């Protein structure tokens, strides 16, 4: 799995099962490769010293300063644009990076590669019981580096205060609708109340600004964009409509089945222009 600058956003992306980090010759990019073992026995993991430190550049010459670390592949929702209804076969726990390994990866990225901000994703990062420990380790070593998570918000109500105290700076919450029925249809779980309580908990913990990421799907929730925007404005949240990516395990994604930015603006302009 490559650890490189994202061509769209100039950020670095690391997956949950990465074991080695080295500097790619010639272009300053760093790559992380999965572990391999002919016997099937997991070898001892080591992150070698970076021999060529310095900023990471993508093919367009942009410097990547953000690192996104996927902490797990597990998720407690089954969003129709992301995962099949029956879920997936999760990675064995022993194959995931430990809190210590994640902290070391972050330290290398910050001290050797010029990373200035770290975001934790998944799967769903809140399913990691050691998330507070991960945040705390990195924050204690690098207190000036912003730390953020992208989450569905389930369970955040109970953990927001501890995460903020550990050093978490801000959150992005994935929320496509505030209609309970639509949420249940999209996420295949009736968990809207838990998400909204999680957002309230984050606000009470001082995790500002709270950013909301929403995916609009034609015929499902695209007509609810104005309602979602009104709710976000009332709460003081930053709302961003993001592109539906071809990540669904059912491989049913088509560009014709997505909604464009122009179409979103048209739906919003009727009420807000």
Region locations from a protein language model:
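Radical SAM enzyme core and accessory elements
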Residues: 1-57
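Conserved alpha-helical substructure of the radical SAM core
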Residues: 3-5, 43-122, 126-146
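Flexible, active-site-adjacent loop/turn segments at secondary-structure boundaries
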Residues: 58, 81, 181-184, 214-218, ...
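Flexible loop residues that form catalytic
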Residues: 87, 123, 176, 215, ...
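A short acidic, helix-capping loop that chelates divalent metal ions and anchors anionic groups
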Residues: 87-92, 158, 179-186, 248-252
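Alpha-helix N-cap and loop-to-helix initiation/capping positions
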Residues: 93-97, 101, 187-191, 220, ...
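Radical SAM/AdoMet-radical enzyme domain recognition
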Residues: 103-119, 128-240
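A C-terminal junction/extension of Radical SAM enzymes
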Residues: 221, 225, 234, 238-273
């Amino acid at each position: 799995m490559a650890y490189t600058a994202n061509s769209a956003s100039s950020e670095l992306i690391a997956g949950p099962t990465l074991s080695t980090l080295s500097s790619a010759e010639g272009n300053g990019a760093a790559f992380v490769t999965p572990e391999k073992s002919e016997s099937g026995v997991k070898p001892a993991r080591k992150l070698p010293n970076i021999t060529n430190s310095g900023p990471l550049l993508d093919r367009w010459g942009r410097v990547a300063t953000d690192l996104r670390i996927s902490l797990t592949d597990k998720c407690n929702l089954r969003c129709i644009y992301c995962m099949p209804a029956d879920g997936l076969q999760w990675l064995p726990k022993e194959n995931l990076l430990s809190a210590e390994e994640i902290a070391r990866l972050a330290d290398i990225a910050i001290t050797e590669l010029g990373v200035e901000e770290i975001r934790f994703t998944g799967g769903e990062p809140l399913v990691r019981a050691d998330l507070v420990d991960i945040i705390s380790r990195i924050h204690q070593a690098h207190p000036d580096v912003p730390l953020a998570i992208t989450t569905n918000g389930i369970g955040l109500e109970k953990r927001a205060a501890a995460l903020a105290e550990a050093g978490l700076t801000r959150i992005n919450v994935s929320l496509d609708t505030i209609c309970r029925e639509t949420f249940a249809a999209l996420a295949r779980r009736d968990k809207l109340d838990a998400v909204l309580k999680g957002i309230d908990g984050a606000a009470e913990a001082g995790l500002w600004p709270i950013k909301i990421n929403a995916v609009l799907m034609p015929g499902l929730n695209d007509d609810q964009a104005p309602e979602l925007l009104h709710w976000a404005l009332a709460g003081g949240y930053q709302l961003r409509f993001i592109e539906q990516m071809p990540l669904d395990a059912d491989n049913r994604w088509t560009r014709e089945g997505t909604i464009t930015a122009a179409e979103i603006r048209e739906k919003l302009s009727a009420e807000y222009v």
